[in-house]
Amino acid sequence: MALSAESKAALVKEFQVAEGDTGSPEVQVALLTKNIEGLQGHFKAHIHDHHSRRGLIRMVNQRRKLLDYLKRKDAARYTSLIKKLGLRR
């Protein structure tokens, strides 16, 4: 399920690095994580929805790339982000 505008704005406000920041890796990873969590519930009910599963895998891969980039550029920001989001690693 897609995020509502209010929940997306709240996530951006929570994870932004500077005022008006919507494109930092932290914000992008947070938005992808919430979308992924929403889709996981969908797949519990719709096991054979392979078309949407492809989109889920694409989001997971994009999040992984952003996390790898952040880990390479600034390890402290990376560790604080995964702790805040509760991601494994």
Curated annotation (Swiss-Prot):
TM helices/strands, residue ranges: none
Entry keyword set: Ribonucleoprotein, Ribosomal protein, RNA-binding, rRNA-binding
Biological process annotations from GO: translation
GO function term, MF aspect, one: rRNA binding
GO CC annotation terms, alphabetical: cytosolic small ribosomal subunit
InterPro entries linked to this entry: Ribosomal_uS15, Ribosomal_uS15_bac-type, uS15_NS1_RNA-bd_sf
Top-level taxon in the UniProt lineage: Bacteria
SUPFAM superfamilies, alphabetized: S15/NS1 RNA-binding domain
CDD domains according to UniProt: Ribosomal_S15p_S13e
Oligomeric and partner information: Part of the 30S ribosomal subunit. Forms a bridge to the 50S subunit in the 70S ribosome, contacting the 23S rRNA.
PANTHER family: RIBOSOMAL PROTEIN S15, BACTERIAL AND ORGANELLAR (PTHR23321), SMALL RIBOSOMAL SUBUNIT PROTEIN US15M (PTHR23321:SF26)
Cited function: One of the primary rRNA binding proteins, it binds directly to 16S rRNA where it helps nucleate assembly of the platform of the 30S subunit by binding and bridging several RNA helices of the 16S rRNA. Forms an intersubunit bridge (bridge B4) with the 23S rRNA of the 50S subunit in the ribosome.
Similarity remark: Belongs to the universal ribosomal protein uS15 family.
Designated name of the protein: Small ribosomal subunit protein uS15
Organism: Marinomonas sp. (strain MWYL1)
